[in-house]
Structures are given as C-alpha cells and as structure tokens.
Swiss-Prot record:
Localization of this protein: Cytoplasm
InterPro entries: ExoRNase_PH_dom1, ExoRNase_PH_dom2, ExoRNase_PH_dom2_sf, KH_dom, KH_dom_type_1, KH_dom_type_1_sf, NA-bd_OB-fold, PNPase
Matches recorded under NCBIfam families: polynuc_phos, PRK11824.1
Protein's recorded name: Polyribonucleotide nucleotidyltransferase
GO terms classed as biological process: mRNA catabolic process; RNA processing
Gene that produces this protein: pnp
Recorded GO CC terms: cytosol
Known cofactor(s): Mg(2+)
Domain S1 motif, residue spans: 657-724
C-alpha cells in the first residue's frame, strides 16, 4: 500500500507518494506539483564495491516527450541522446547530492529521475532535485540528511522563491541554491538583461539595455534569502519523510588508509623533495613530478626491506604534499608558485590571430590558455532545440562551446564527444556573457573555446577570451566580462581565500567557486563547497576579494581592446527598412525574386515580415550595396497595400486597346500584376503574355521589368491586359 506525504511549501502544494511504483529499487518516489509528475529512483549495489577511493555515483535526468503530449522531434520517434538541459540538470543533481555520501562509500549507485508529466508553470529542475533527495533520504542507504534546491528570482526588485517559468521571464536574476538545513553545498547564479533602456548613444546609433549586474551585498542578501527557504524546506521534508523512511542498511565504509609509519617516514625524510615537486606542480596539472619522487623513495633501503609497494609510497607522498600545500597557504600565506593569496598569474592577450575567422582571442593566464573563436551567422542559423513544455521549436542564437583536449594537461588521449564537464563549463561561460549582448542584436553568434593548456580556471579563461572575441567581432556588448576562479583552505579555526587558483589548489582546497562579471558587478557565479558549509560573512569576503581580481583582469582586457584590428573575414552587414506590405514582393513567387538577388549578388538576406527590416550580408561590400539598391528599387516600384486598396475608377483612366508602358509588380501562377502609369494595377493573364504557350510566368517576366501592355477590358474596379507584342 502506498504512503503519501502532502504539504504546502512556498505557496505550492507538494505531494510525494512512496511504495507505489519501482518497488525493486532501494528508494523511489512519485513527486507531484500541479500537473508535473516526476519519478525518482535510487539503486545501490551493496554486493559489488569498487576498489578505488571515490564515490561511484551516477545521476540521470530524463525528460519523456509523452510528458507534454508530444512525439520526439526528428526522424526517429524515440528518445535518444540526452539534450543539453537534461545533461546539465543531471550535473546539478549530482553536485548537490554527492556530498551526502559518507567517505568510504564505494558501492555503485544510480539515481534516475524521469519526468512523466510536465507543467509549464513548474520548475522541473528544482522538482527533480527535491524528488531525488526524497528517494535518497527515505531509501535504505546510509544517508541521514535532506538536501533540496530552491530557485530565487528578482522581479521588480523583490526576491521571489521558486518563481514560475512565466515569472522567471520577467526576472533580472536566476539564482539556484542547494543545501541542507544547516549548510550551503552548491550555488549557480546568472543575471538576466532586461528591455529597460539605461542609455542611448546617438552618435553610435546604439541602445544600451540594463544588464542587471549584481553587487556583492545584493548577491549575499539573495543567497541568505535562499538559505532561509532551504532551512524551512529541509525541516519540512525531514519531518514529513520520517515515517516513510526505510531502515538504513549497515554497509561497510571502506577506509583507504596508509600506514602512519610510511607517511611519517616520507614526511620526515623527503619533505624538501616534495616541496621541490610542488613548485613544478604549480606549473602543470601533470602528476609526473610526484611520481618521480615516489620512484626515488621506493629505491630507498627502508622501502625495499619493508616491501612497501609503489602505490603505497605514492599515496603517502600525495598525503604529505597536501599537508605542505595547505600549511604554506594557511600559516605562511604563500602559495606553491610563490604568489600571495590575492595575486593573479601573469596574463597575455592577443586578438584576431586567425585571419580566416570572424574573430579570435588567445587568452593566457599562467599555464592556462584558451583560444576563443567567434563566428557570426544570420538569425535563422541558430541551434534549434525543443523545450518539453513548449509546443513549438525554440532557437538558440548565442552558443558557447568549450573543448578540453587531452593535450591541454599532457595526456595522450583522443578527442571524442562532449562530456558533462565540457557542457557545464561552456554553459557557465554563456551565462557570464549573454547578459551583456544587446537584446536587439538578433544575429547568431557561436563562440568556441579551445583549451590549449590547463592549470586551473579554464572556464574563466573562456569567459575572458570570449568577451574579447565578441568585441573583436563587432558584436554590441554593454561591457567586457572577466572571470576568476577562487578557492579556500580551512584548517581548524584558520582559513585563507585564494584568487585565481591553479589545479593543485583546486585539488587540495576546500572550496571552488568561479565569479564572472563586468566593472559594474557580477553576471554569473558557480560554487561547490567541499567542507560542508560556509558562513555568509566569509562568502562576502571571498566575493569582495574576487572583485579585486576581476578588476585587475578587466584593466588588462581593456588595454587589449584598444589594439583590436577587425578581421578581414568579418561579414559586412547593411540594414534598412521598407514597407512591411512590400516584403512579399521582394520575396516573389515561391521565393523566386529573393533567390535571384542572392545568386546574382552573392549575399545573404534576412527579411522581417512584421517590421519590414531588410538585412543584407556578405563578403564583398560593393555587392552588398548593389543588392540593397536592387531591393529598394523593387520596393519603391511596388505599391503598398494602402495604395492598392484605393478605389480607382479604371474607366475614367484607361480605354480599351490603349497601349501603355507598365512595370511588373508581382507574379502569380495565373499571370502577372502590372503597375500602370496612371495608377492602379492590371492583370496580365498567363495566356496573354505571349503567342507561344507559357508554362511558368517567372520564366518570361521578372519583378520590376518594364513592358508594353494593351488594355483588353476595362471595368470600373479592374482592368485586364495583354502583351502589346
């Protein structure tokens, strides 16, 4: 018999139904809000432990198209490769719940979340995390803490918990926070630009929209607001789920420990060697330096006589290395590469180094290097994708694709498909940059970040290089965006905040968070906390220190901006407007006219039927000018709907057998409409164009062509013509 927990939380009725479906799993729940129904299951293989020191957790978030009464798009009518949203949501759930697993839990575990019914007013990402938490918390796994997620929006300067999708469209903030009733574990945040104009540059003919960057105080306030909501939600969940929770299975937590005597031997005799290796590690993410030290130690008489295995020695070296790195930072306030806690590594910037690309930027910070390439295309060239709750297909016109080849960290491995990490890093960079792009700019922009070297903070190098690549491509942005990766080391009651962390500090530190923004404030943030929580006062201190680093990087980027020389491959674009009623004339029958213009002048043309905007782009300036003039001529010679609807008395203007010179206005299957010199238009039927049989009007006539026509019949409201020849 099923067990149901029902309660109201943040103004929404939530229903969790247990022991109804998927009863073979360790934990399962049907979670419902409104018309949204999500199934979350947890399965752990207690009899199949792995032999490595990590938590073998896999999370899958799956959207079923039947949940929105739709069929899968495309040729194959079955769900296949996960969408970017599904992958990113899986990653969010993983990062939120992984800290709950106790150290030494080595049993393969899979959390599966399936959307069975969708509701456009329900945030599926938040519901799915909370459903996964419910399944995990009530399962027989040794998880004794509830972790849930909340989303915070800012609508008309008011913070809102778990806004609907419709409300989020009017929000200037998208903040997603996951945590327990005591601790914050994960934060993702981006600002959203609004249509509100803050400035109009008359000389540059540009409008600057409000990008809504957040200052540090406002962001901490929003996080505190979310933390209060998390506390309330987790207390509610823990109380509600207490009666339905299964008895916890007692599993063995494997301790991957090394004999203290080995660690002491390495620490007492080889600390200086390890320190030297640490200095080299500061220049690379490769682990070869530590292995060299371990090999040297393994040849020592002590290790040989005690038959100590190489892997044990290497693990002992890693333990001592971590101790040294953390002690240097916390006690000596110096880092492995000699930097102070607030110092940023040396930066070099080059723009437009690839002559055949629209734009490019090589951004190097220490041993991290990103080559970011920008490409511009038309509005219709974006990435089409489906949103589960939308009936129509959506278009993504700004893309950031992040690639992390093995050679960037000295690994000999081939390049395959995009992984979750690469999708996540690209998505973070996109969040940081998209708010600064002019909302009226509707071209498609693709940034590709090729990480050529990596020693920490490659996603933030992508942000910096991406912002300059946008600038180098002439794309209207409100300001440059810089990003910096921050870290923290905590030892007892001491802590140290690090600016621009490298791979070594990321691995041995207690917190990794990335902050991106302009000179006005923060546009995006991502934080993962390894130490089990952070005080808001410490978080604010870290944000202010990040601001110092960001300001320094922005000053160097602005210097590099002055040296930008536009690429010769950059597409030339001319834009003008015509009467919207004449757009169809420019298009012609079945697109014949516009195809002819495109082929004749070797250009691309985008037309907006609603406002009459015409955009012509191409590689040859004269061709673009000629194409624009040609389109304007067609438009000027075509009557508007207003003119065509005038009540013209043809009997007063024309007489039968009269020959006049007219101009082809538009083509139809049955003939051509001819603009007459005294006003109005007449029909030249396909049978009257020539003595020879005409199969296709467009084969013998074209828009704008002048020809002699003879008046056959005249009536008060219409006139019939034939070719005078």
């Amino acid at each position: 018999m099923s067990k149901v927990c029902e309660f109201e939380l943040n103004g929404k009725q939530e229903i969790f139904e247990f022991e109804k479906v998927a009863k073979q799993s360790n934990g399962a729940v049907l979670a419902k809000i409104g018309n949204a129904v999500v199934l979350a299951t947890v399965v752990s293989e207690f009899d199949n432990p792995v032999s490595e020191d990590f938590t073998p957790l896999t999370v899958q978030y799956i959207e079923k198209t039947y949940a929105a009464a739709k069929l899968p798009g495309g040729f194959i009518k079955r769900e296949g490769k996960p969408s970017d949203f599904e992958t990113l949501t899986s990653r969010v759930i993983d990062r939120s719940l992984r800290p709950l697993f106790p150290k030494g839990y080595v049993y393969p575990t899979t959390i599966t979340v399936m959307v069975l019914s969708a509701d456009k007013n329900v945030d599926l990402q938040t519901l799915s995390l909370n459903a996964a938490n419910a399944a995990l918390y009530t399962s027989n796994l040794p998880i004794k803490k509830s972790v849930c997620g909340v989303r915070v929006g800012k609508i008309e300067n008011t913070l809102v918990i778990n806004p609907t999708n419709e409300q989020l469209e009017n929000s200037t903030l998208d903040l997603y926070v996951a945590g327990s009733k005591e601790e914050l574990l994960m934060i993702e945040m981006k600002t959203i630009s609004s249509s509100e104009l803050v400035e109009i540059d008359i000389e540059a003919f540009t409008k600057i929209h409000n990008t809504n960057e957040m200052d540090e105080d406002a962001l901490v306030e929003a996080i505190a607001f979310a933390q209060n909501a998390l506390k309330e939600a987790n207390l509610t969940y823990e109380k509600a789920f207490e009666e339905v929770s299964k008895e916890k299975f007692e599993v063995e937590l494997v301790k991957f420990t090394i004999e203290e005597s080995v660690i002491n031997y390495v620490r007492d005799n080889f600390s200086n060697d390890i320190k030297e290796a640490i200095k080299k590690l500061a220049k690379s993410e490769r682990a070869t330096q530590l292995k060299d030290v371990a090999k040297m130690i393994s040849k020592n008489e002590y290790c040989i006589s005690n038959e100590i295995e190489f892997n044990t020695i290497y693990e002992a070296v890693s333990v001592v290395k971590r101790e040294i790195v953390r002690a240097m930072i916390v006690n000596e306030r110096v880092r492995a590469d000699g930097r102070g806690l607030k110092d940023v590594r040396p930066i070099s910037i080059e723009t437009n180094i690839l002559p055949s690309t629209h734009s490019s930027c090589l951004f190097t910070r220490g041993e991290t290097q990103a080559l970011v390439i920008g490409t511009i295309a038309g509005p219709k060239d974006g990435q089409m994708y489906e949103v589960l709750t939308d009936k129509s297909t959506s278009m993504e016109n700004f893309m950031v694709h992040y690639n992390f080849p093995g050679f960037s960290v000295g690994e000999a491995k081939p390049m395959f498909g995009v992984g979750r990490r690469e999708l996540g890093h690209g998505n973070l960079a996109k969040k940081a940059l998209e708010a600064t792009i002019d909302k009226d700019y509707n071209e498609t922009v693709r940034l590709v970040s090729e990480i050529l070297e990596s020693n920490g903070s490659s996603s933030m190098a992508t942000v910096c290089g991406g912002s300059l690549a946008l600038k180098a491509a002439g794309i209207p942005i409100s300001d440059l965006v810089a990003g910096v990766a921050m870290g923290m080391v905590v030892e007892n009651d001491k802590y140290a905040i690090l600016t621009d962390i490298m791979g070594l500090e990321d691995h041995d530190g207690d917190m990794d968070f990335k902050v991106a923004g302009t000179s006005k404030g923060i546009t995006a943030l991502q934080m993962d906390i390894k130490l089990g929580g952070i005080e808001l006062s410490v978080l604010k201190e870290a944000l202010l220190q990040a601001k110092e680093g960001r300001t320094h990087i922005l000053s160097l980027m602005k210097d590099a901006e002055k040296d930008i020389v536009p690429s010769g491959a950059l597409p030339l674009i001319e834009q003008f407007a015509i009467d919207p009623s004449k757009i169809m004339v420019v298009i012609g029958k079945a697109g014949a006219t516009i195809k002819e213009i495109i082929e004749k002048f070797t250009v691309s043309i985008d037309l907006d039927k609603e406002n009459g905007t015409v955009k012509v782009s191409g590689g040859n300036k004269q061709n673009i000018i000629d194409a624009c003039e040609h389109i304007k001529t067609i438009s000027n010679n075509a009557p508007s709907k207003k003119d065509a609807s005038k009540n013209i008395d043809f009997e007063k203007l024309y007489s039968e057998d009269e020959v006049v010179i007219g101009k082809v206005e538009r083509l139809a299957d049955f003939g051509a409409f001819i603009l007459l010199p005294k006003g109005g238009e007449g029909l030249l039927h396909i049978s009257k164009i020539s003595k020879d049989r005409v199969k296709n009007v467009a084969d013998v006539l074209s828009i704008g062509q002048e020809l002699e026509v003879k008046v056959l019949k005249v009536k008060k409201d219409r006139i019939e013509l034939s070719s005078a020849n």
